[in-house]
Amino acid sequence: MEATKTDLRLLLECLKYQMKWPGSQKQALLTIISICKQNDQYVEFLREIGGISFIYNLSKSSTFSQVKETALFTLASLAELHESCKQALCREEMFRDFVQHLEQEMPLTEKRVAVYMLSVLVANNRCGQTLAKTSRCIEALLRLFRQSFPVPGESYEQLQLWITVSSALCGSVNNPQNEENQNVCMSVFPEIKPWLQEVALPRAELAQPLCSFIGMTVANNPCAQEYFVSVGGLDSLSDTLTRVLSQSTHSASVCKMATIITKTLSACISNNELLGSSLSKLRVIPGLLRLLSSPNLDPQDQLAVVLTTGHLTDACVEQQSQLLSAGGLPIIITLLTETSDEELKKAAIFVLHTCNRITESLGPGMSTIDPNECDREGQWRSAGQILQRIQLLEKKIGKKLWERDPESQPHSMKRSDSHVECDDELWEGSVMRKVKGNHRVYGEFRAIPAGTPITSEILQDQDSLQPDSSEEGLSPVQVNLFKGPNWEKSKKRKHKQKRENERSDNQETRREGVNKRELKRNVKSERVVKRLKMMNLESDDDGYELLQNCSTPTEGNRDTQGPDIFRHPDPVKRNQREPSLSDDNMSLCTELLDKEINKFLKPPSASKSNTLRCAGCVKHMNELNSRSFGAVLSSCRFQCDFHLTLREAEDRFRRSQPLKRTSHTPTHTHINTHRKIREHSTSAQEHKQKSKREKHKLSHQSSDRCYRLTPLRRPRETYSPDVKQWTDHRHLKKSSEDARSKNSSGRHRKRQNWSDKELCYLTKGVKRFGHSWNTILWKYPFHPGRTNVDLAKKFYHMQKAKAQGVDLSVAKAL
């Protein structure tokens, strides 16, 4: 970085000392731009060393045109790269210099670079917009905008200058919106009206800058919108759009130009229904529908076309009739069902929602509509077919969702009707107003014969036959399209009847739940028994196939052909493991137990309902193992079927084991006490070994009545020296316990002096673990027979001897 900063200093010196060489200065300026584009810190460094000020002075004082152009372009590029540089250049004197610069006679390229510099300073900058107005720079730009409009046959540089001026004006009035500058710029609307008539295929390059300026100036400004309409600009824009839309299906460039004009039209009529209703005579809706169905339309531009259609249909009923007569409903609904863009879906629903008054236009107002343009029965038939398509698509989407992730769906089996709530906020009437809607997804739709005309009476009959076909039974679009004339009268009655049905359904659901719980208490689960029995089928090929293909029994009788398509699938056995080839059925039972414990003792998540029933189900995995399992279940008054079966198996296992009896004979004072103790210890060891052999033999018997509930103990690895030292230490501890049991008949243990190593172990242990005597005893290899009390007393004596100044060698015998 330091080397780059040195290069910037050298380039700045080159600019200062090469005043007579414009080529060298131009190359130095372009090199500065390329360096500063690498890192924003270089722009800040150049500003600190005075490079920005020098380049600006060079743009004013240089006598070479190419140096002025390059200097202005360098300033614009640096301001675009760094915000602090832009704010440093935003001074009123600089804007006044720009005004003088634009009014002078200069080459078109230099003037274009100056306008580009000005557009960078006002873009996304409230301070720059204000300075452009106070310094009368906007007036200079408007004069240049009028004078530089390219007539046919002029040079390409003239067109580029006019496009740059339009961009600078757009930045001064919007982003952020500046109403004062908008009111100043709308004075050029009368000159724009004839320009709109020249926007056609031969001069398609005029559409983008001209429409951008109009859209930015009238956006969210009712005063500018009304003035644009008063000078005839809206009519001229609509005529241009109608003329271009007729050619949109033949050329992609014309389709792009039509999209640009459509966006401008939407900005001119947004939030103003009166302006939208004035366009009904021009019949813009059919042209927009042709544009929407054009194969040349970019999918990214569909949103603007649909929004403009929604603004027009929301303005008046006549344009809704135009939408219906031109076949707009199938196009909009097809777009709604096939697109994956959420914003486009909202816009399509907004268009359909604005057609809620279409029934009125089809009813009393039919006399004012040409019968050749609007076939009522044909449109109803078309709408019915579209409704069937929507519901078929909903079925397919629902099946895909269930197949993709059935566990993430809500548990709706307890309810008779599955309804999905849609919380998306939709535009209604205008961009600022919003509406919410609910819809219920149906599993079946009673198909109507294609030859039968679908009228409002037929739809009313369907509503009477289907108690759920109310406003909650259909989507907001379907409700608005298929409301009959008597729908409002029966709405309250249907809501009242629905509430009564919901109360009765809730009571029946509660009674069914109580009955099911009573049945579950009295009937054992056959599912666990089948799983345990299937473990013995591993040697049978048929049993192996059965184990691979089996699934857990379902709860209740469910009709797979029922109308409720959005229902939970039957629970299946996931991630099924192939049967092990081990001959030890006890280890298989242990693996099954661990698997079921992991399954039932998972912490409840947000997407699954809490179905814990007993202490075995409630305990977490770190609180429960195969040894504490029986104690936990015995403390619970009620066990589920699964844990009750496991507890019975454990009881059978414990009853089959031989009772371990340890006889403790009273000690008497006798000469041969030690000899009898040794004999007793020998007999106890023999009995213990015999019991182990019997248990090992019993564990290898293939019996269905006895199962091992604890995993087989694996031999410890003794390869590392730490493990070996720990094993030796445990062996020493065991021998010390045997020694204590052998000497338990006497009153005192044999006295053993403390070695130097033991004292060292004790000192290190206290430093490391404090007064945790048990930890110290098990951590270090003390002499067999030492206890935690011995360690505590010895440390106390050591501290006492140390305080009295006694040598620790003497304290060994304390």
Curated annotation (Swiss-Prot):
Residues 499-521, 565-577, 679-688, 714-741 have a biased composition (Basic and acidic residues). ARM repeats lie at residues 93-136, 327-368. InterPro entries: ARM-like, ARM-type_fold, Homeodomain-like_sf, SANT/Myb, TERB1. Residues 746-799 form the Myb-like domain. Keywords: Chromosome, Coiled coil, Meiosis, Membrane, Nucleus, Phosphoprotein, Repeat, Telomere. One of its GO terms (biological process) is homologous chromosome pairing at meiosis. Residues 461-521, 551-584, 653-753 are annotated as: Disordered. Residues 488-512 form a coiled coil. Component of the MAJIN-TERB1-TERB2 complex. Meiosis-specific telomere-associated protein involved in meiotic telomere attachment to the nucleus inner membrane, a crucial step for homologous pairing and synapsis. Component of the MAJIN-TERB1-TERB2 complex, which promotes telomere cap exchange by mediating attachment of telomeric DNA to the inner nuclear membrane and replacement of the protective cap of telomeric chromosomes: in early meiosis, the MAJIN-TERB1-TERB2 complex associates with telomeric DNA and the shelterin/telosome complex. This is Telomere repeats-binding bouquet formation protein 1. The gene is ccdc79.
